[in-house]
Structures are given as C-alpha cells and as structure tokens.
A protein has these predicted regions:
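Extreme N-terminal basic, low-complexity initiation segments
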Residues: 2-15
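…; additionally, a secondary subgroup of soluble metalloenzymes is captured
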Residues: 18-283
C-alpha cells in the first residue's frame, strides 16, 4: 500500500522551482485511534511525500534553516529514506507527480503523464467513454500577464469562477475545438476534459510549473502542438471580448484570457483501471 501525503511546510511557495523529491517509508504501527490510523486500518507500509518543501529559489535554504518543525523532526527518525528522485527545476512534470505516477503504474516520462486520461475513466459513463486508448488532456482557463520581456501565468486555475460562467465559456469555445477534432467535457468550473488525437504524444507542463512564471520554457513547439497554438490564439481573441470577462472585470476579478493544456496522453493499455495498483490513496 502506498500513500502519498501532500503537505506544505509553513508558507513557502517554491512550487515552480521544485526539482527533486525525497520519499520516506513508514514500516511501523499506526494507532487506529488517530485520524491517520482511521484512514489506514490495515497498517500497511506507508510512503510520505511532502511537495514544495524545498527549492533552489533564492532564500529558500536560509528560510528552511530557521523553520521550527518539532513534529516533523520527531517523525523523520521513524522513517526509512528511499532513493532520491532527482530532476531539473524546468522539468515539465513536478517530482510529486512523477512519484505518484510511478506508484500508480502510469507512464512517468517528463510531461507525458496521462492524468487527464485517468480522470476520464472516472467519468466514463457521463462522457460516453468508448475506449481507454483515447487521447485526453485537461484544458484550464487561466490569466496570462504580458510584460516587456515575457508572458507569465498570473492565475491558474481562475479564482471565483462560477459554474455558470465556466459553462457559458465552454459553450462558446466548444465549436472551435470540434472543428479541430477535439471534444470538450465539463469537469470543474474553469477546468475541462478534452479528447482528441493531438494529445496522444503532446508534452505538457503541469499548472504547478507555470503558476507565476514565464511561459517560455514550457510552450510546446509548433511541430508538437500542431493546430493547438492557432486554436489558443483564436480562443484568446474570443475571451478578450466575451461578456463573462466584462462582468468579471466589472466586479474586480481577473478575466480568463487564456487556456493551458496539461496532463495529456493515453493510458498504456485497454485494461488499466483506476486506481492501479490497489491500495494507492492520496490524502
């Protein structure tokens, strides 16, 4: 049994710079009377993963040195460190996503973890899933901010985006996607599932990577993305003049002025089900 426990230390937010992860394994007894024990009554081995706990960003290491974490310091001697998962700070998939993909038996090639295909399985009846071999991606509404030297993602996903606003924008955009062989399905406000062959081998960056950073390192090439770059440009023009964004700006909210594709890919075989293997749980 593998449990990926996600927790942030203090108020550090080094999300985009996170390059490596240390995984710790617990082989002891978990008191069933505790909140953690109630989640895992069988007391199987547990792995603890703490995303965003450190980064190469300036000031991070001095900040970590001064942190007082008595509970974590008590816990670490009880755990066994596993091999370090090293990576580049500009990798497309953050380390905690790579670790979870490995635990689930999913492909974990950088930028090609098929998270959207996994999510599509969960909603197979609602979206009339025909085959596990379809290619999927997440489409997330976001706000891009242009400066003199770069374009960065200021907000992803969009905050306070109502379900009705998301549905209205989806209805406006869906016909344009369909012209390019892509079908959109609502998932959450501002976050949709997209099905289309263009996503089969499209490398995409996690929203965790691009939040607050320049888009340049993670923009797919024209060769990789095909008509998607043109489609995104068309959708930006549509969003620029859409009444939903006029209403958002009138109430002081950021407009949704762009899209971000992520989690693209295909499940490795027809028989893979979620979760795989059994016992993987995220808390």
């Amino acid at each position: 049994s593998v449990v990926m426990a996600a927790a942030s230390l203090g108020k550090l937010h080094p999300t985009p710079m996170n390059a490596m992860v240390q995984i710790w394994t617990w082989h002891g007894h978990i008191d069933p009377a505790t909140s953690l024990g109630s989640r895992f009554p069988h007391n199987r081995a547990m792995q603890l993963l703490i995303p965003y706990a450190a980064s190469h960003a300036p000031g991070c290491q001095p900040a970590l040195t001064g942190l007082k974490l008595p509970n974590l310091q008590k816990l670490l001697p009880m755990l066994v460190a596993q091999p370090l998962d090293t990576g580049e700070e500009l990798s497309w998939s953050p380390p905690h996503e790579r670790a979870l993909a490995k635990a689930l038996g999913l492909p974990h090639q950088d930028g090609l973890i098929p998270w959207a295909a996994v999510e599509a399985q969960k909603h197979a009846n609602r979206i009339a899933l025909e085959t596990h071999l379809d290619a999927w991606a997440f489409v997330t509404l976001c706000h891009w901010q242009a400066s003199t030297f770069e374009v960065s993602v200021r907000q992803i996903p969009m905050q306070d985006l109502a379900g009705g606003e998301s549905d209205t924008l989806l209805a406006a955009m869906a016909p344009f996607f369909e012209q390019d062989g892509i079908t959109l399905h609502p998932l959450q406000p501002g976050r949709w599932l997209a099905r289309g062959e263009v996503f089969a081998n499209l490398r995409t960056a996690s929203p965790d990577r691009v939040q607050g950073r320049s888009l340049e390192p993670w923009m797919p090439s024209t060769l990789e993305a095909g008509n998607l770059i043109r489609l995104v440009s068309e959708m930006q023009m549509l969003l620029y003049t859409h009444p939903v964004n006029d209403a958002r700006e009138a109430r002081g909210s950021l407009p949704a002025n762009a899209l971000w594709f992520s989690g693209a890919g295909v499940l490795p075989n027809e028989n893979l089900t979620w979760p795989s293997p059994q016992g993987v749980q995220v808390i």
